[in-house]
């Protein structure tokens, strides 16, 4: 029997991976070829999707992108056999731009440093046995009986910062919740991934859900919480099914419920589907939504670590952060020497340790997921994602999501350091690691107005700077674009942005200055002509 791997990731399905899987299965039945069709997550290099992999005694081979018209040729070339070794007649395939080879030689993967995405695309997402065989649960089994202070100290040593956008040190949140004198504490995983150009949370939830669940359980055991929640974006239908099934498997395996792994410690995880509002990705608005209230931002202090869900101490981290927890705390040699912790701390930059899961989309040849060390330059990342034959065809990149800054594509910004401190120095944010590349067909005036319209629509309305400021900036911007009192209106726009940055209750208002100021600074000639 030949193992045949095809992704059922949401993005892969949108590229007809499901239809290709059905056609291959039917053709195998017709030819009486015994194949084992295995659905996986996606490697995240979407120009190759639908990607078909076969595994035999010679290894794993990939072919993609496969179209319906290629299916018969694949079978005629005996791809689905034990003797296939990667050599076959490519005459019919090269015309369609099909690539093939051993998965170990897949260059877009080989050059990455995949720590938390190492299983995505390789193993069936809901196979707990495969997860365990690949090192999963080693972190949980190790820390379940360790002193909580030691666990938090190891997270501190690793240098892990939250991957939700703000980059706040993870250990501080956990330590604060641990020290709070409360019988009831909560763990919340923020899976309300709403930024444009961000899709890593969804991909790992669909492709390796056990790594997230393990990280959440570790957090609960460490700080003394009994209940955890995954707050999932309402549009993530496939991820919802995957998470619910994974939670059932964990319950049946004794990883959730009473006496986890016979330790005497209890912890449960529930899934909550979000209300669909962009601002619910902000941690306090998310908590309000979880309490069946309107998703509006809370005043701080107190922070959620002191008064969070139902006013109880709450650890609130995003999906990728919990995945890094599972990685960092596993593979120990003894209590004080952790191979993964040491490696994580050794890569990246001084203030941005480890890897970042960059999500590259737009005008690139190979859009997708690139898990690379913090501090990689923009040029290195763009080259890895396919490169460009003509730099002049590119106009801009936006880094950090909808509220991230726009940068021109030139020699100065090709050397941009992709880290928290590197983006800060250039007046930008790293955010969730989303990078959208624009060519010269993009209308940046339209992008500016669309950003302002989005902020107006998505403001929760609680604070005046955001509610009124975004509307006022749009009015003034429209005047500027009509060449009405340009200097005076630009000055007022700057004053309002400064007010919003200092007085808004959340990032929706406080970070609006990043896209607006960067567009006006770096693309002034286009915006004002």
Where are the model-predicted features located?
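Short amphipathic, charge-patterned alpha-helical segments
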Residues: 215-219, 373-391
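Histidine-anchored nucleotide/phosphate-binding helix
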Residues: 208-222
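Conserved phosphate/anionic-ligand binding catalytic regions in large, soluble enzymes, centered on
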Residues: 12-13, 47, 136, 155-177, ...
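Hydrophobic alpha-helical positions that pack around
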Residues: 112, 240-374, 386
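Fe-S ferredoxin-like electron-transfer domains
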Residues: 59-157, 285, 295-310, 441, ...
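Ferredoxin-type iron-sulfur electron-transfer modules in oxidoreductases and energy-metabolism complexes
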Residues: 3, 17-39, 56-81, 138-155, ...
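Accessory "access/gating" subregions that flank catalytic or transport cores
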Residues: 141-181, 341-346, 351, 359, ...
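Short acidic, glycine/serine/threonine-rich loops at helix termini
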Residues: 16-18, 48-53, 166-174, 198-201, ...
């Amino acid at each position: 029997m030949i193992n045949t791997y095809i992704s059922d990731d949401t993005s892969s399905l949108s590229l007809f991976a499901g239809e290709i899987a059905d056609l291959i299965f039917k053709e195998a039945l017709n030819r009486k070829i015994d194949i084992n069709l295995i659905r996986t997550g996606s490697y995240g290099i979407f120009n190759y999707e639908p990607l078909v992999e076969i595994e035999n005694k010679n290894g794993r081979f990939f072919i993609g992108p496969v179209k319906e018209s290629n299916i018969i040729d694949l079978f005629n070339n005996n791809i689905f056999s034990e003797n296939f070794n990667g050599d076959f007649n490519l005459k019919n395939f090269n015309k369609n731009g099909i690539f093939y080879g051993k998965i170990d030689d897949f260059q877009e993967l080989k050059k990455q440093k995949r720590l938390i995405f190492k299983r995505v695309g390789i193993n069936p997402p809901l196979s707990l046995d495969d997860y365990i065989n690949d090192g999963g649960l080693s972190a949980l089994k190790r820390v379940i009986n360790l002193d909580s202070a030691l666990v938090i100290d190891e997270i501190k040593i690793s240098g892990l910062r939250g991957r939700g956008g703000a980059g706040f040190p993870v250990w501080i949140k956990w330590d604060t919740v641990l020290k709070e004198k409360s019988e009831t504490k909560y763990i919340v995983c923020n899976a309300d991934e709403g930024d444009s150009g961000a899709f890593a949370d969804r991909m790992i939830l669909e492709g390796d859900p056990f790594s997230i669940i393990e990280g959440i359980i570790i957090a609960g055991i460490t700080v003394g919480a009994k209940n955890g929640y995954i707050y999932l974006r309402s549009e993530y239908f496939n991820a919802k099914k995957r998470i619910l099934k994974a939670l059932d498997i964990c319950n049946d395996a004794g990883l959730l419920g009473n006496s986890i792994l016979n330790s005497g410690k209890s912890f449960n995880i529930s899934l909550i589907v979000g209300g669909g509002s962009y601002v619910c990705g902000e941690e306090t608005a998310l908590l309000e939504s979880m309490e069946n209230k309107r998703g509006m931002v809370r005043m701080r202090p107190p922070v959620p670590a002191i008064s969070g869900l139902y006013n109880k101490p709450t650890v609130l981290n995003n999906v990728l952060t919990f995945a890094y927890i599972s990685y960092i705390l596993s593979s120990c040699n003894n209590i004080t020497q952790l191979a993964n912790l040491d490696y994580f701390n050794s890569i990246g930059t001084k203030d941005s340790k480890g890897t970042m899961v960059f999500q590259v989309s737009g005008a690139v040849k190979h859009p997708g997921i690139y898990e690379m060390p913090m501090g990689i330059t923009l040029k290195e990342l763009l080259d890895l994602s396919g490169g460009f034959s003509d730099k002049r065809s590119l106009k801009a990149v936006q880094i950090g999501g909808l509220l991230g800054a726009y940068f021109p594509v030139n020699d100065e910004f090709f050397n941009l350091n992709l880290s928290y401190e590197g983006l800060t120095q250039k007046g930008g944010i790293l955010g969730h690691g989303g990078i959208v590349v624009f060519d010269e067909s993009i209308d940046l005036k339209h992008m500016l107005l669309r950003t302002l319209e989005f902020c107006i629509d998505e403001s929760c309305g609680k604070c005046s700077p955001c509610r009124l400021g975004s509307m006022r900036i749009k009015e003034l911007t429209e005047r500027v674009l009509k060449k009405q009192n340009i200097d005076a209106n630009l000055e007022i726009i700057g004053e309002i942005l400064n007010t919003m940055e200092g007085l808004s209750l959340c990032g929706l208002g406080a970070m609006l200055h990043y896209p607006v100021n960067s567009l006006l600074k770096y693309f002034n000639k286009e915006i004002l002509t």
